[in-house]
Amino acid sequence: MLCDNFPGAVFPGCYWGSYGYPLGYSVGCGYGSTYSPVGYGFGYGYNGCGAFGYRRYSPFALY
């Protein structure tokens, strides 16, 4: 998978946090899902490739 500035929807019907879901979680995707229901990883973006400071992801990859 890519390691760059995602437009929001990385997977079909899934979002990696901020853009698609303001709460900062991705539904059924894993990255920052139920472990961060209100943007637990706010200011972090770990997509399995590296930490990004401009995303609301969980600071760790769940899947």
From Swiss-Prot:
Region (12 X 2 AA repeats of G-[YCGS]): 12-54
Chain coiled-coil ranges: none
Keyword Repeat: yes
Pfam families from the UniProt entry: KRTAP (PF11759)
Keywords of this entry: Keratin, Repeat
InterPro entries on file: KRTAP8-1, KRTAP_type8/19/20/21/22
Cellular compartments per GO CC: cytosol; intermediate filament
Tissue-level expression: Is essentially restricted to only one vertical half of the hair forming compartment and in beard hairs is absent from the central medulla.
Annotated family: Belongs to the KRTAP type 8 family.
Function (record text): In the hair cortex, hair keratin intermediate filaments are embedded in an interfilamentous matrix, consisting of hair keratin-associated proteins (KRTAP), which are essential for the formation of a rigid and resistant hair shaft through their extensive disulfide bond cross-linking with abundant cysteine residues of hair keratins. The matrix proteins include the high-sulfur and high-glycine-tyrosine keratins.
UniProt subunit comment: Interacts with hair keratins.
Name of the protein in its database record: Keratin-associated protein 8-1
Gene that this polypeptide is encoded by: KRTAP8-1
